[in-house]
Curated annotation (Swiss-Prot):
NAD(+) binds at R164, I165, A244, G245, R246, D270, H294, I295, G296, T297. It is found in: Cytoplasm. Belongs to the D-isomer specific 2-hydroxyacid dehydrogenase family. One of its GO terms (cellular component) is cytosol. The gene is tkrA. InterPro entries: D-isomer_2-hydroxyacid_DH, D-isomer_2_OHA_DH_cat_dom, D-isomer_DH_NAD-bd, NAD(P)-bd_dom_sf. One of its GO terms (molecular function) is NAD binding. Catalyzes the NADPH-dependent reduction of 2,5-diketo-D-gluconate (25DKG) to 5-keto-D-gluconate (5KDG), 2-keto-D-gluconate (2KDG) to D-gluconate, and 2-keto-L-gulonate (2KLG) to L-idonate (IA). Keywords: Cytoplasm, Gluconate utilization, NADP, Oxidoreductase. It catalyses: D-gluconate + NADP(+) = 2-dehydro-D-gluconate + NADPH + H(+). GO terms for biological process: D-gluconate metabolic process. This is Probable 2-ketogluconate reductase. It comes from Dictyostelium discoideum (Social amoeba).
Amino acid sequence: MTSIKNNNENKHIVVYRKIHQSLIEKLENQGYKVTQFEPINSNNIQEFYEAIKTANGLIGSVFKIDENVLSKAPFLECVSAISVGYDNYDLVVLNDRKIPLMHTPNVLNDSMADIMMGLMITVARKLAYCDKRMRNGEWNGPLDKSWFGLEVHHKKVGIIGMGRIGEVLAKRCRMGFDMEVAYYSRSRHLKVEELYDAKHQDLDTILSTSDFICVVLPGSQETKHFFSFGQFSKMKNSAIFINAGRGMTVDEVALIDALETGKIAGAGLDVFEKEPLNKDSKLLTLDNIVLLPHIGTSTIETQHIMSECAVNNLISALNGNLEKNCVNASIIKK
């Protein structure tokens, strides 16, 4: 644990993830006392609990901020997540205590769309599979069809969840790869339809006609196992399934079955039901899936921008400004 003191300690901020020193200094220059954990682990968890007893603000990600944690922070005025998703935060308790929860939308749209596009290409063209075989010394002459992949360009992509990330992904698919774009969403997005000739279709139509299914759904009880046996059975056997939204939206048992039985051709995952992925997961034994350790936003540039946004969000919230990036602003203002 690194404790950074300040002459004007009117408010105490606990940062529970490593952020750039310039951002720590920005908080200090605002008059805050800052305590930083890089990150929370079994060796410093008790120190963290002790620190939040006097905390007015929290900044971080990954670590679960549940009722137990919040009960140890009686003076808490704001929580600022270095993420877009907020399923690691007990929103019921935060709402009840009128504590604003800030997050960092928009800043990661491009990096998320890039990782999904990368997964589409890697799975379709068997890049990881071919790399593995080359390293095993299997390239001994002309290639047989087991090395061959599928085209990406001019195919149909079905985007499930047309939010900010979905819109940026649609742009890449349409403008970069001349793909036909369809999307499933509660409401229509006329801008996407106009710019990228995207079609708003029902779920069954998208599942049965798309070459690529790309999932960017948020995590909630409503979307838990949104994709299970029934959904995979409706897909083309040449379909490729990509998920970089939330792991809970996919029933991994059903996905494994679809991959093993040839119901779909392949898959690419950046998120999982349980993270880190269990070392004995059957997903690790399959050659027709590409697995990434939740790195959708893990670029140096995006991580810094997200951290900077989270710091700015916290400062704004502690100054009473909830107009931007506040998840529960409508509850707080009641």
